[in-house]
């Protein structure tokens, strides 16, 4: 698990899971991202009162969207977890294209169709360009 998403190794342009976390997460959250902005964040497992670090999540989003060689979709979800340690620490769990994620009580009904539309346009352009 990484707090710095830019340090995650790549395999043919894809991120790899590279570390097993023995102690598990105190809480797990799905962050809905559109064009680099957090649209919503929902807890999907663990303690709802143990929140991830906003600053860490913002750095994760920036690092992911600026990773060399990545064709980052405009709409995606970033799953993060809070791990137990002296200071609670936010780690990346995984990233999903927006079409391939559970919405886990996404409360922003205005942005939901926009996120699907933006992802679909990005996908169509990606296919044309390959």
What are these regions (language model features)?
Residues 71, 84-130:
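C-terminal active-site "lid" helix and adjoining low-complexity regulatory extension at the edge
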Residues 1-68:
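Active-site nucleotide/adenylate-binding loops and adjacent lid/helix of ATP-dependent enzymes
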Residues 29, 71-85:
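A short glycine-rich, hydrophobically flanked beta-strand micro-motif that places a catalytic Asp/Glu
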Residues 53, 79, 107-110:
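Poly-acidic low-complexity segments
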Residues 42, 81, 96:
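Anionic group-transfer/hydrolysis microenvironments
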């Amino acid at each position: 698990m990484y707090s710095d998403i830019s340090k995650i190794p790549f395999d043919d342009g894809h991120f790899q899971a590279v570390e097993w976390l023995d102690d598990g997460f105190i809480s797990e959250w799905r962050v809905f991202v559109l064009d680099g902005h957090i649209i919503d964040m929902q807890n999907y497992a663990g303690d709802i009162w143990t929140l991830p670090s906003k600053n860490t999540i913002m750095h994760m989003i920036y690092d992911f969207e600026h990773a060399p060689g990545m064709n980052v979709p405009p709409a995606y979800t970033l799953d993060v977890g809070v791990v137990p340690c002296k200071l609670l620490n936010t780690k990346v769990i995984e990233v999903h294209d927006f079409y391939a994620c559970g919405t886990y009580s996404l409360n922003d009904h205005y942005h939901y169709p926009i996120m699907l539309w933006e992802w679909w346009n990005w996908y169509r352009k990606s296919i044309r360009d390959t």
